[in-house]
Amino acid sequence: MNLHEKKVLVVGAGRSGLAAVKRLKALGARIVLTDQKELAQLSGISELGLPDGQLVLGHIPQWHEVASEVIVLSPGVSPKLPFIQEGIAQGALIWSEVELALRDHPAFKIGVTGTNGKTTTTTLIGELAKRTGRPTLVAGNIGVALSDQVEDLDGEGIIVAELSSFQLEWVDSLRMNVGILLNVTPDHLDRHGTLDNYLAAKARIFEKQSPSDCAILNWDDARVRALAPHLKARVVFFSPTSLLAEGYGVRGDEVVLAEGGKITPIIARGELQLRGSHNLENIMAAIAAVRELGLSWEEITQGLRDFKGVEHRQEVVGTYEGILFINDSKGTNPDASEKALYAFEEPIVLIAGGKNKGLDFHDFMKTIKKQVKSLVLVGTAAAEMEQAAKDTGIQNYLRAGTFAEAVELAIAEAEPGDVVLLSPACTSWDMFKSYEERGEFFKELVRRHYREPI
């Protein structure tokens, strides 16, 4: 669709919304930007150069105020808002900012989705893709809005996009040359309602693929594996736990590729800097993706050896008085935090809690009972988590009134040889703007406690 002179409504004036406006201006669209926050509460609006008549701010609008042919939704905006529902009824198209950025872009596009591991996988693919010498953009749900960046790339470029279920929910004609679905476990059920709806949103990454494209799937995840017969693209499987007849798997301590009856060793686990068996999912998916770019095994293995991981994902803060501190603030659901718990053999003092996303904590507490020496709970979900801990028979837990108190309690519980792990299993939105802010504050508190210069 040519958007020149088309009226387009952008809902949400955060990072994605502002990037969408800039992209739409370049495409010659007639833009209306709406956000329920007042102008004084928003940043970056004046730089857009939109006249007052194109800004509808400070309230949730009626459809007649913002009626448009296309609605571009920011990821955090609920499509159930009445004016959006009326727009759908009136025939307006709904796109995510990702759809706007990538729908007609000529670059080679690699999309990564899944409940957990997206950011690590996306970042690793980006680092490996740069070894091709081609211009490479890493963006999406990873913190850089795609619409802000894509104009600088042509058909020689590579785009590696982390894609959330919110972003994929409203794609229309977006086609990924390589689509990756890492795993699916209950998450964002407050938005999607059911696990089936959540999976359906994730699976849209494959919807417009053709037989010349590649779909990379986790063999070990039954829900993900079951998608394979329904996909048009060539399917490549990976398994972090077994040797597959065809695909990426493990043989002893090695990551290998089984293909056409031949097994090719790729790298030994001991050569990798990423800890935890769950990171094998991320590594195998990344290998499969960059093989589509024609990288040699030597280039891939050197890139894997060099990769140290991503900030706020099992990030080593430091060892102080014999205690190892790990920042896993990106663990925003129980499944992600469970994987972090299995990454360490040392006794663990766990800091958990924050804002729940409508998820149950009882299975998580069963893992905590096996893997955790002491549990410190904080945030609005603390009472719910405490009840689940009691129901599971956990006795060694503490409640903190503030995040700073939680860190001090964890330090007091820990002994030399222990790990103090921040992996909250909840979002940060009750106390912080983002998981990044939470992780930075954790690191600051630890260093301040041990009087290390910040």
Swiss-Prot record:
A GO molecular-function annotation: ATP binding
Coiled coil: none
Top class in the EC scheme: ligase
Record: residues binding ATP: 114-120
Keywords: ATP-binding, Cell cycle, Cell division, Cell shape, Cell wall biogenesis/degradation, Cytoplasm, Ligase, Nucleotide-binding, Peptidoglycan synthesis
Catalytic activity from the UniProt record: UDP-N-acetyl-alpha-D-muramoyl-L-alanine + D-glutamate + ATP = UDP-N-acetyl-alpha-D-muramoyl-L-alanyl-D-glutamate + ADP + phosphate + H(+)
Cellular compartments annotated: Cytoplasm
Annotated pathway: Cell wall biogenesis; peptidoglycan biosynthesis
InterPro entries in the record: Mur-like_cat_sf, Mur_ligase_C, Mur_ligase_C_dom_sf, Mur_ligase_cen, MurD
Enzyme Commission code(s) on record: 6.3.2.9
Cellular-component GO terms for this entry: cytoplasm
Main location: cytoplasm
Keyword flag Cytoplasm: yes
One GO term of the biological process aspect: cell wall organization
PANTHER family, per the entry: UDP-N-ACETYLMURAMOYLALANINE--D-GLUTAMATE LIGASE
Function: Cell wall formation. Catalyzes the addition of glutamate to the nucleotide precursor UDP-N-acetylmuramoyl-L-alanine (UMA).
Family to which this protein belongs: Belongs to the MurCDEF family.
Protein name as it appears in the record: UDP-N-acetylmuramoylalanine--D-glutamate ligase
Organism: Desulfitobacterium hafniense (strain Y51)
